[in-house]
Amino acid sequence: MLRLPKKGLPRFEQVQDEDTYLENLAIQRNASAFFEKYDRSEIQELLTTALVSWLSAKEDVRSQVDLPCGIMSQMNNVGFSTAILLTPVDPTALLDYREVHQMIRELAIGIYCLNQIPSISLEANYDQSSSCQLPPAYYDTRIGQILINIDYMLKALWHGIYMPKEKRARFSELWRAIMDIDPDGKPQTNKDIFSEFSSAGLTDITKDPDFNEIYDEDVNEDPTYDPNSPEETAVFMKYAENIMLKLTFSTTQIQQYENVFIFETGYWLTNAIKYNQDYLDICTYQRLQQRLYLQKKIIQKHFEKKKDIRRGIGYLKLICFLIPFLLSLKKKMKVPYLSSLLQPFSDDKVKTERELPPFIYGRDFKCQNFHYKENQYFHVHGGIEFDISTPSIENALEDFQKNLEKIRDCAANTFIEDSGYKEYYSIPVMEFHGKSYYVIYFELETFYQQLYKTQWWGAINEIVNNLRLKRLPLTDAQLHEQFKKKLGFKRAMKCKSIPFGMKSAVERGLSAVFHTFSRKTSSSTINVSDEAGYTIFHHAALHNRVSIICQLCNANFKVNQRRFVTFSQGPTPLHLAAQACSLETTVCLLCSKADYTLSEKRGWMPIHFAAFYDNVCIIIALCRKDPSLLEAEATAENQCTPLLLAATSGALDTIQYLFSIGANWRKTDIKGNNIIHLSVLTFHTEVLKYIIKLNIPELPVWKTLVEMLQCESYKRRMMAVMSLEVICLANDQYWRCILDAGTIPALINLLKSSKIKLQCKTVGLLSNISTHKSAVHALVEAGGIPSLINLLVCDEPEVHSRCAVILYDIAQCENKDVIAKYNGIPSLINLLNLNIENVLVNVMNCIRVLCIGNENNQRAVREHKGLPYLIRFLSSDSDVLKAVSSAAIAEVGRDNKEIQDAIAMEGAIPPLVALFKGKQISVQMKGAMAVESLASHNALIQKAFLEKSLTKYLLKLLKAFQIDVKEQGAVALWALAGQTLKQQKYMAEQIGYSFIINMLLSPSAKMQYVGGEAVIALSKDSRMHQNQICEGNGIAPLVRLLRISTIAEGTLLSVIRAVGSICIGVAHTSNPVSQQLVVDENAFPVLIQLLRNHPSPNIKVEVAFSLACIVLGNDVLQKDLHENEGFEYADVLYLLHSTEKDICLRAGYALTLFAFNNRFQQYLILESGIMTISIFERFLESTVETEKAMAAFQIVVLAKVIRDMDHITLSARGVTILVDSLYSVQTSTIVLTGNLIASLAHSRAGIPEAFTTLGTIQRLCYHLYSGIEEVRAACSSALGYLTYNANAFRILLKECRNKPNQFIRIKNNISRDASINPAFLKEFQMQQTLVGLPSLSLEKNGGPSIIPIFKRGKEHRRKLKPKIQPKDSLTLLPPVTNFMGLFKATKKTKDSHNIFSFSSTITSDITNVSRPRIVCLNQLGKHVQKANPEPAEG
């Protein structure tokens, strides 16, 4: 009933008009609707928080609190009616103006009416769901949605699990029924739990393309730490329930000019561990922190990948400023004019989730941060907070002040043109100083009750006051219901005990429950300490329960109350808040006049806790309160500043922030330790790397580390070495800094220490930098070699392994003899007695490198009995040891026939062959390397390998996919081909045309070379093979290689020779088929270009010779070469005057081929330049018989071209020299002479007669009895061609009649392509048939002597029968040389026998040295047998 006043009815002017009445009614209706979204428990939380908040405006002096620093205490002049905010733009995620206005509206209601600022905390429920604990004012708001979405994505990245918002909202309602959750929160279902979650939409977050491989990246730069080791995982999971990741936002800059505010905000990703020091000691904390740091790095790197997240972060940054800004306006009685804002979102658009369903891991989920049992689901925890303190307001920059009117116009005109509904409302943007800023505008009105009019805040306050009387305090039933909902039935029953219930309410953040309990009990009961000495106040600070702290402050509890056990120097609530990153609590306590200068037992103030526990936002709040705290020293222990404590704990974020605000990094603790010393002593290498990047001359990290290496303290030396070991691996250039700092001599001194762990770490560090030549030189100069060799005799295999690696690196830098001088080789060989694989690998690799190109070291390995060890490892059970020993044997025996024979004598060949019967291709590759080395220029070893059918195994390597395996197989095969043409031809036939052509097409220089050599071997004196190569399209690959400009010179030489060899046959006969095919492949232009332009004279002269082979005896091609290709003999003639004898002689040979049996070409040569006998004289007088014979051949053919001597005289001299050469004792001379005589025997008239006159026939017949097949073949060919001369015909027929076996020898040894007079064959057969041959016993007819000089019987022939039978007979010289190499005097050389040297460097494979990045001290003395070097039984 409406009661009228006694003065009667009101006057008309006092009555509200109808419009005002309707407006008030709408306001009251909206206010009532605002509260309809809450259920009873939420209303109770809302009312309690609004009632007790320290942000509520009270006039009671006793309840006054300090204002937060910054804008709330500085803003004075608020005479403006509009506010304009400028904040930087993120162009990749633009904000929406309507969203901004929505948030301003929600903040106005939350701050002005309900005294609540936004935040979120995800709290665990008893059934493993997670409550989205927002301040109740922000339920069902856009701000609440953004907070939940951002925090959920943070937790999703932390756990690697995600469920889309729509699906998780639906699943949140159903999952308990699906799982059949009992009152204790346990699932009773028999269903596959993960399948249910998966079908509901839960997935591995890496399925999202934006996060596809984020957990595959290794962000751990400390090799000493394995975050996924069982020990670290177990420790982490022990404390995981109370570890949380949270985002903290803080305003970093504010500028003001009149009503324009320019601000910037930042955020930090912080981890908080809600344990006090009784449950979590500092050492364990640092272990957890190290793992969390790696997890944070991944999240920070990928968190803002999605546009929605970047936009959400942008809104949260804006909210971070709006909170203190609106609080400041509230203090100045100003409020946003909500009616001027854009239309709000409907209620169904801003619904917030009250809880989140649990997470669960699938078997194949990639994230390894947490380890739960299979099918175990779990809750998530974390939060987002805003710092309501701000930096001091600065005056706006001049650019902003000058453009004030433009800013105001831009802000005011935003919605004038189009105020209708739009999907997206853009915020105007302006540029200042090259940076874009949003221009956000809203109107203000006065914040007080107006006459006759009800304001929106008045209506809400009225409802709050009415509800408070109805809803508070809670009944016992409501208390039980609240506890049961959050904690489960069993624990809810325990909460009937007030102390237990109050503590549970504090830990869970149940403000209304705590308010009710506090009404039921006395202050003394509330303030009682638990068994650890902590009060409710401490627990509230630790768990960041601001509303409960407000209740305690309102009840006049001591804000500086200490933990008390046996002494009163325990931490205050502010200490615990600083430790646990309770940002809101810290600001609340500071404003409640908590003493931030109090120290606990270690002398730490809250600022020290914040620095040590890496809580940047707490440091910001404390330093804004009192900037002097930045350099505050702890009052006990080492008197550390916050910066020094941060270095002690490795709090990198804190260190970076403290440096940015000017903390004094020169300060030291009481022991003189600065930030570098403390980082080293506590092994925080991330901090050291950061300081290195700062590059502050007064903070010399490298110099400091060297000083620590040189000090007396074992700990300081050890920690310095350990830090250097890690740092040198962090950056590819840090090794140089270590070197330049003079670290090497200090490290060498440490090697002389008696501390085995220090020695281990030192050699570990040295092995990480010894891969660089300059570091090796410094090591040698500092006397490191004898120190390292001395360590080889210690008892620790880890030291052996590392020292061997370093010596391996040193040996690669020309220090092989120095290592040998200090008895390095016997020391290394002694280690081969060990049975530890990584040691054996490194030792054998070191021995291998020491022997590369060093005959003395090769002999030393044999002399010190190292060969049996290496050979024994060929039969090891370990593939690695087999491969490494093979590689070592290859270098020990390379180019040293004496050692090769010794290795064979020790029994290396059978186990080497056995390697190829295994399946490991890498082992076979190294075995092939050993085969190549041992067989090179060693006929006996080649024979031994061939007798064991090694060829078929090596051929399998040619089928491998890897190019390096193919080329090693090819090189090994060619090493087995030996130096005789017969053996090479046999090997080429075994390889086959297909493989040879594939080699020529290969990109490998080695393969191309072997392919070229195989073509030479096959085509040499064999028209059949030449034609088959042509038919198999083998010429095109050869010509293609000629066109490659980058081809290796050795390979190019081989290919050029192959092209020539394929066109020339026995006794300088030609093959018109192959000649024409070579020309058809356009080889002429390529060869002419090489002849004229290639820088190497070797290439030029070989091209000239090949051109001569291509046109030999082919007038059409000779004409084509001269007329169409522009070939001139002058291009070859000038090579005759080369200072190199080989080139000069080879050029003469090329011209000889051009002139051979061709008078016209001789004329062209004569016209092209002057050729005198002096060119050949040095060869004709040479002591090298092959040079002399070749020059003699040339002057005979070129007799009419040489101008200064009669051609008859020249021919006679040449023939005489060749005949005399047949009396040589050198095989190569006889073979060459026989072939040259065969060629001259079918040249011009008179030459065969001259040979016959000089007794050539008899001498050639004598050589038919030689034991060397090449000699017999060459002489047989010469005799065959001489039979076309009548006189020679008669003499040879007589020889064959008197010695019946003579004809058989000629027939058996003559080359298939060589020619013999058919008339001679017919005549001999006729005389054999009709006349008969004399008895073999007639000595007077040339028969055998009674006392035989030579064994010529059947038995001898059987022994001479070669095991290698190529398809056609072999003659002449090794095709690799093509006569050229025979013209040098025989001399011993230390160089490789390979004419074309290829690098023998081992590719990256299983034979690499074992170089672990870090020495694990906890593994010293523990060695597991990894390999059995003894052959397996059976």
Curated annotation (Swiss-Prot):
The protein's name: Ankyrin and armadillo repeat-containing protein
Topology with respect to the bilayer: Single-pass membrane protein
Residue stretches spanning the membrane: 309-329
Pfam families: Ank_2, Arm
Repeat (ANK) residue spans along the chain: 532-561, 569-598, 602-631, 638-667, 671-701
A cellular component term, taken from the record's GO annotations: membrane
Entries under PANTHER family matching the protein: ANK_REP_REGION DOMAIN-CONTAINING PROTEIN, ANKYRIN AND ARMADILLO REPEAT-CONTAINING PROTEIN
SUPFAM superfamilies linked: Ankyrin repeat, ARM repeat
Compartment annotation: Membrane
Main subcellular localisation: membrane
Alphabetical list of SMART domains matching this protein: ANK, ARM
InterPro entries: ANKAR (IPR043379), Ankyrin_rpt (IPR002110), Ankyrin_rpt-contain_sf (IPR036770), ARM-like (IPR011989), ARM-type_fold (IPR016024), Armadillo (IPR000225)
Species name: Homo sapiens (Human)
Cystine pairings recorded for this chain: none
Tissue distribution of the protein: Ubiquitously expressed with highest level in pancreas and lowest in skeletal muscle.
Extent of the ARM repeats: 732-771, 773-812, 814-852, 855-894, 897-936, 1072-1112
UniProt keyword annotations, A-Z: ANK repeat, Membrane, Repeat, Transmembrane, Transmembrane helix
